[in-house]
Amino acid sequence: MTTFTRTITLVCYGSIALAIVGVFGTWRTAGAVSLDGLEGPYNGWLVIIFALIVIAGGRSLSRGGWLGIILVAGCAGVMILTGVEDLSDDVLGGRSGWGIWLTIAASSVLAGVAVYSGVKRVRGSRRGEPRTSP
């Protein structure tokens, strides 16, 4: 396992762990009421489901496989969208909590890792010289 592969794997799994921790953290506070990502109108369960799917594609992403890159990028996009949508949906009033911000930030790092791996894969697959026939 190369240093790059190990680093991508650690960042990927660390981001997944932080996103799940964020789901169980405070997403909205209104007075004495505090809700996490699984309570009330929030869709934190989607973040958990897609984070578990990303675990399956994490190794493929770290090796630079297209299936892993696309899987992680798509799941991270859904995780970001879920957090941003719940953040902008101000049904209860009050203010946003640390959990929703942690979930959005960790999901954004996960998407960034997928984009970085995709760019590295594309740049690494180009040849320096034009191909000639034998």
Segments and roles (model prediction):
Residues 1-134:
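Compact integral membrane and secretory-pathway proteins
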